[in-house]
């Protein structure tokens, strides 16, 4: 999406999107993609400025990309491990642009530690951010979506929800709790899709596969055995965009691998970059 500019009459004109974990990687790419189609995007993460994280990328960077392309976006710094911060995020997002039409649950905190030594505090933190954080934000945005009989919720999952990376020997050591979190999110998404179907709200989960992001680099998940599986962040962003713009009566309750989804619907990777 290098050099992309906003389509003033895009398919998301008039929509408000809230994207968590939007300071880098998948979240940043999703925020930019939605903004390119006219959505007003609220970006949130813990890192707003350089020097606040060991990883590259900030909310300020994401907002600059969007605004430089002619889009509308703002950021709200928040720690999604805290309920009061999630509530403040929702209030400030609505104050900025109005009720949320699209919620993208992408925020995550991840520790790869063998299960026999996994600390309870870190387990609780992962569940709080990835699982309960997504549920709580959904609780906050749902009343507005129900009132308008319209909305889309997308959660970022992982193939680890089903099994670790193959071959098993030496692959993704300590990823059991991460996989548990993602499995919980997938079951949550399919269950919620059933609950809100009559309200014209779609709920789906996207499994990105291995993606070239700063977080993946830190955990050293890309090596000579896995490099052929790596997808660009633009694929995931495009899959999210395609999902939130389709008929919610037909496109809901799905768990899709991003690249396979794009192929199924006739969108090729070459069209995304």
State where each predicted segment sits.
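A short, exposed helix-loop element centered on a Lys and neighboring polar residues
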Residues: 138-139, 190
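Active-site loop of short-chain dehydrogenase/reductase
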Residues: 15, 71-72, 99-100, 145-159, ...
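Catalytic loop of short-chain dehydrogenase/reductase
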Residues: 154-198, 210
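Short-chain dehydrogenase/reductase
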Residues: 2-97, 111, 121
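C-terminal helical subdomain
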Residues: 183, 198, 205, 223-273
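Substrate-binding pocket helix/loop in short-chain dehydrogenase/reductase
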Residues: 114-115, 119-124, 174
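Conserved Rossmann-fold SDR core element
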Residues: 34, 99, 186-211, 249-256
């Amino acid at each position: 999406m290098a050099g992309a500019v906003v389509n003033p009459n895009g398919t998301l004109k008039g929509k408000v999107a809230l994207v968590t974990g939007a300071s880098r990687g998948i979240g940043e790419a999703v925020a930019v993609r939605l903004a390119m189609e006219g959505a007003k995007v609220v970006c949130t993460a813990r890192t707003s400025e350089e020097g606040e994280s060991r990883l590259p990328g900030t909310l300020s960077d994401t907002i600059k990309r969007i605004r430089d392309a002619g889009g509308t976006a703002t950021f709200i710094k928040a720690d999604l491990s805290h309920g009061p911060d999630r509530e403040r995020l929702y209030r400030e997002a609505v104050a900025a642009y109005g009720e949320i039409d699209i919620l993208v649950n992408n925020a995550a905190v991840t520790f790869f530690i063998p299960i026999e030594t996994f600390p309870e505090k870190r387990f609780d933190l992962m569940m709080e951010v990835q699982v309960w954080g997504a549920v709580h934000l959904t609780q906050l945005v749902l009343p507005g979506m129900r009132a308008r009989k319209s909305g889309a919720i997308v959660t970022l999952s992982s193939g680890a929800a089903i099994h670790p990376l193959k071959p098993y020997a030496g692959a993704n050591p300590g990823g059991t709790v991460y996989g548990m979190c993602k499995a919980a999110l997938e079951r949550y998404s399919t269950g919620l899709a059933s609950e809100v179907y009559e309200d014209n709200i779609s709920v789906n989960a996207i499994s990105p596969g291995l993606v070239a992001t700063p977080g993946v680099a830190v955990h050293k998940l890309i090596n000579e055995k896995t490099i052929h599986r790596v997808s660009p962040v633009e694929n995931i962003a495009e899959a999210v965009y395609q999902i939130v713009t389709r008929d919610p009566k037909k496109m809901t309750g799905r768990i899709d691998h991003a690249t396979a989804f794009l192929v199924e619907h006739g969108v090729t990777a070459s069209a995304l970059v």
